[in-house]
A protein has these predicted regions:
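C-terminal non-catalytic regions of proteins with extracellular/luminal or membrane-system context
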Residues: 4-380
């Protein structure tokens, strides 16, 4: 049960167009496709396990639905091969279904099985972010059937999901989910568990954006590309839910010892119970050296029933506001700090005075406030 709960809590919902998820367990036909659908992905350095200990996504789907639902499986292609494949068979199966669950991504099981070519893990870097092998071709061919496609990215790294975000009705990332990954994924797909995972990394639009991370330092120059959008596809800290939350009552107070207390109230304004990952970010507005656009300082995960509200409290220490000055001494400087609390990382407008734009579009995303910090601490 612990493995199943850990897998459920880590799943990140990236897209849910027209609220297609959660699915009904009474659907007539579900196609489960892709090289990861009936493959076991416990992750790197996994010891050999006993038969039956690991459950695939296909197994989880079959266990979740009723007897009246027909589940059809077709691999379509393997993880890496560019040669012979069964994409045509997968397309045929997809065209006969009510919904398609397409499981693509990585293979990282060489410690548990033999004769498997890994695509993720130690010593397996990739020069591209396109899905390996024929997986991208499989995705586009299946989506061309017109059937609603839900992409399950079972991976240990970000991939370029630009095309998938256009074509798929929903996208979720279940990573390399371990021995109970299949049932945990089914729990999210059918609404037995409300997803609340957040991205611990940034998903770029293109490999040309790398390195790409949320807490970059401002350059004082232009932030743009001539041939594509500057911003990432999915931001660090991003993730959707089957319910909605609203933030209010942000309070920021500087204490005599230099600590800062931050409070905000979070309310579930939707119709489903669910978790919210409340994230605390800080932006140092002006400093003696260049500082990062924003930085995650703390987070907490809370559970709220429909209509329920909770007040979340954080405490920042002076060290968490400190920087390395031009002498490489760690110091704390007084001045303006922007304090941000929300369910996702704050957004920004990539132009001059970029820090001024860091914030949230509305109270459903989060809140921000300014603090004129009065303490100064020099290096020991």
């Amino acid at each position: 049960e612990m493995a199943r709960q850990a897998a459920r809590e880590s799943i990140v919902l990236l897209e849910n167009k027209d609220n297609i998820l959660p699915l009904s367990k009474d659907m007539r036909t579900i196609a489960v496709l892709g090289p990861g659908a009936d493959d076991l992905q416990p992750g790197d350095y996994t010891p050999k396990l006993q038969p039956g200990q690991l459950k695939s996504v296909l197994t989880g789907i079959k266990q979740a639905v009723g007897k009246q639902t027909k589940v059809i499986y077709e691999q379509g292609c393997d993880f890496t091969s560019l040669g012979e494949n069964n994409i045509a068979k997968a397309v045929k199966v997809a065209s006969q279904s009510d919904v398609v669950l397409l499981v693509l991504g990585d293979c990282s099981t060489s410690e548990a099985t033999t004769d498997v070519y890994k695509t993720s893990g130690e010593n397996h870097d990739y020069a591209t972010l396109i899905l390996p092998g024929k997986q991208q071709e499989l995705l586009e061919a299946v989506c061309a059937t017109g059937k609603p496609v839900i992409l399950i990215l079972q991976a240990g790294r970000p991939y370029n999901l630009s095309k998938a975000s256009e074509l798929c009705k929903a996208i979720l990332v279940n990573w390399l989910p371990g021995q109970e990954g299949g049932p945990a994924t089914a729990d999210v797909l059918f609404g037995d568990y409300n997803p609340a995972g957040r991205l611990p990394m940034t998903f770029p639009r293109h490999v040309g954006q790398l390195p790409l991370y949320y807490n970059f330092k401002t350059s004082g120059r232009r932030y743009e590309y001539s041939d594509m959008e500057y911003y990432p596809l999915y931001y660090f800290g991003y993730g959707l839910s089957y319910t909605s939350f609203e933030y209010s009552g942000l309070k920021i107070q500087e204490k005599e010892n230099g600590n800062i207390t931050v409070q905000a109230t979070v309310k579930n304004i939707g119709q489903r119970a669910g978790d919210e990952v409340v994230q605390l970010y800080v932006t140092d507005m002006y400093a003696s050296v260049k500082t990062r656009i924003t930085e995650l300082k703390d987070f907490t995960r809370i559970h709220l029933k429909p209509g329920e509200a909770k007040t979340v409290s954080f405490e920042l220490t002076p060290y968490e506001l400190s920087l390395l000055n031009d002498h490489m001494d760690r110091v704390v400087e007084k001045g303006a700090f922007k304090i941000l609390v929300g369910g996702v990382s704050p957004q920004y407008v990539a132009k001059d005075r970029i820090k001024d734009s860091v914030g949230y579009a509305d109270s459903k995303k989060g809140l921000s406030g300014m603090l004129e910090y009065t303490h100064e601490f020099a290096a020991d």
